[in-house]
Amino acid sequence: MFTDAIVRGLDGDDPSTPSANANQPNDTVHTIAVFGHRPPELGGYGENSTTMSVRRRLIELLRAKLEMHPDLQVITGLGLGVELLAAEAAAAAAVPYVVVLAFEGMEQRWPEATQRRFSELLAGARSVITANAEVPKTSSQFARAMGRRDDTIMTYTTEAVLVRHADDRTLGDLQRKLERNLEEDVWVMNPE
């Protein structure tokens, strides 16, 4: 099982340099957090035109941001949906990414193919941070663990991308929190 900050997947990363160690706050790295919908709001759990479009647009955005910020990195929770797409887009755009897990083993209830995809993306991360030491046992503990994970992500974030339908209410609180913390550096992308 992977533990905090031991997985480094990019050639040339030097753990002693600040940009390669996401466990230390670092003002010199431009970090984009990516949040968004889970699979049901993206057309389902399999690959489809919506997930392909979101991934493609994230790749284009990251390539453009990389030209503006050569020290760019992505930070993601690697949850189902947009967060997995964000890691895939970062890898495709040759942008390093950091993973903040809500807790160890969060993928264990997922289908086997998705667990393999998760493991591959986790292995490719610049570093991995685990926000909660304990695995939640109840739905309220799970919600708190996810909230702590989001708060951990935000401590490293320079700007954010939120993939959501404009009329969706589930991500409204997160959008307001991001806008409060990052002001105008929050980009909302419609998944369609």
Residue ranges of model-derived segments:
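Acidic/glycine-enriched connector segments
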Residues: 4-192
